[in-house]
Amino acid sequence: MTKKALSAVILAAGKGTRMYSDLPKVLHTIAGKPMVKHVIDTAHQLGSENIHLIYGHGGDLMRTHLANEQVNWVLQTEQLGTAHAVQQAAPFFKDNENIVVLYGDAPLITKETLEKLIEAKPENGIALLTVNLDNPTGYGRIIRENGNVVAIVEQKDANAEQLNIKEVNTGVMVSDGASFKKWLARVGNNNAQGEYYLTDLIALANQDNCQVVAVQATDVMEVEGANNRLQLAALERYFQNKQASKLLLEGVMIYDPARFDLRGTLEHGKDVEIDVNVIIEGNVKLGDRVKIGTGCVLKNVVIGNDVEIKPYSVLEDSIVGEKAAIGPFSRLRPGAELAAETHVGNFVEIKKSTVGKGSKVNHLTYVGDSEIGSNCNIGAGVITCNYDGANKFKTIIGDDVFVGSDTQLVAPVKVANGATIGAGTTITRDVGENELVITRVAQRHIQGWQRPIKKK
């Protein structure tokens, strides 16, 4: 049997009043990514040919935050219920394709669960994702007759007997385009809310003698939504613990999974150690035996083997060679590239610069738009003065250079191999090979000096 084409509809038009935020609900993040972006990514993983994104509240913000997403933007000007939302996309449905309905505020649904749901869909019928809850309050109840799903009753429309049912609707369903269009046209709003419920499709399918099957989600959290910040925080921690558990099983030593955040992807070698309160963002690659101290933030970095990153260091868009030591309290800004066996110490900031093998920048230093050769020593308080108020300029330092403390290198300037720069020097001209340069004012001694006295 030929596999049907698939398209997805993502409902994302809600305001999210209980978030108390100017952002539309679905733009609030899980692991640093908008909830709806998680759902869009899952729809792509399923192989969806089209993704119809139903939006409404905060439309401009939605389009700004999701500007790069390959979706069909479908505006729902009035929020009149879930069936009304899907109906806005119905003109785009192909009769012979499967349509899966997803929710922008339920970000943890997995590709594997949806594949099972699609596989279970009967010809011309509906496959419905359900879950059993100990406390089903607020959810639509699944009504069965002789084991078959015949209806879904919303909380506000349920009678006392129906309210005791534990099996509930998640809202996720699959049917073909032709059936969706046929049934959506027949949905009414004769209910307590006066809305057009997507759940009414179940009864309509039964009226047409079309089979409705239920597939139960095995993980309740996978189908949980976030309507307020408390629920959002619960989803965040669940997702982070799930990611941490996977990394632990792969051999990464995360000392406290409850205090670890992965907001992107992590590729790792063997015997990696990650202390508490570490945040990984973007795409990060860690070599073998990397140690990351408490409170560090790593974003889009590549770290070589045997590197130690000491506590409270921040690295972004940088590359670090093997056996380097960084921190504590170091900052590598975009474009920083450290070669093997380099040392970058406390309160050092490096931006758009290269540091050669074995060189040390140990404390209280700013290096920007620079090239530092191998086996150099950059003393405390050194500043590369790279900006004249309008343009940036480069500082180039050769190999085996010693730069004394409190030196200012006013770019553009070059320091040749083997040069020595005395402490407190301001360099404004190029320094030759093996030269010693000192620009300090001669030290004066005044005997019997009297300090000024405050006037009474």
Swiss-Prot record:
Task: Enumerate the active-site residues.
Answer: 363
Q: What is its EC number?
A: 2.7.7.23, 2.3.1.157
| Positions annotated to bind Mg(2+) | 105, 227
Q: How does it associate, per the subunit comment?
A: Homotrimer.
Its GO biological process annotations read:
cell morphogenesis; cell wall organization; lipid A biosynthetic process; peptidoglycan biosynthetic process; regulation of cell shape; UDP-N-acetylglucosamine biosynthetic process
Ribosomal protein as UniProt keyword: no
Q: Which SUPFAM superfamilies match?
A: Nucleotide-diphospho-sugar transferases (SSF53448), Trimeric LpxA-like enzymes (SSF51161)
Subcellular location as annotated:
Cytoplasm
The gene coding this protein: glmU
The UniProt annotation puts the region (Pyrophosphorylase) at 1-229
Q: Which family does it belong to?
A: In the N-terminal section; belongs to the N-acetylglucosamine-1-phosphate uridyltransferase family. In the C-terminal section; belongs to the transferase hexapeptide repeat family.
Q: Which amino acid positions bind UDP-N-acetyl-alpha-D-glucosamine, per UniProt?
A: 11-14, 25, 76, 81-82, 103-105, 140, 154, 169, 227, 333, 351, 366, 377
Major subcellular location class: cytoplasm
* One term of GO molecular function: magnesium ion binding
Q: Where is this region: N-acetyltransferase?
A: 251-456
Species of provenance: Haemophilus influenzae (strain ATCC 51907 / DSM 11121 / KW20 / Rd)
Q: Which UniProt keywords apply?
A: Acyltransferase, Cell shape, Cell wall biogenesis/degradation, Cytoplasm, Magnesium, Metal-binding, Multifunctional enzyme, Nucleotidyltransferase, Peptidoglycan synthesis, Repeat, Transferase
Q: What is this protein called?
A: Bifunctional protein GlmU
Q: Which Pfam families match?
A: Hexapep, NTP_transf_3
Q: Quote the Gene3D superfamilies the UniProt record gives.
A: Hexapeptide repeat proteins, Spore Coat Polysaccharide Biosynthesis Protein SpsA, Chain A
Record bears the keyword Hydrolase: no
Query: What PROSITE patterns does the entry give?
Result: HEXAPEP_TRANSFERASES (PS00101)
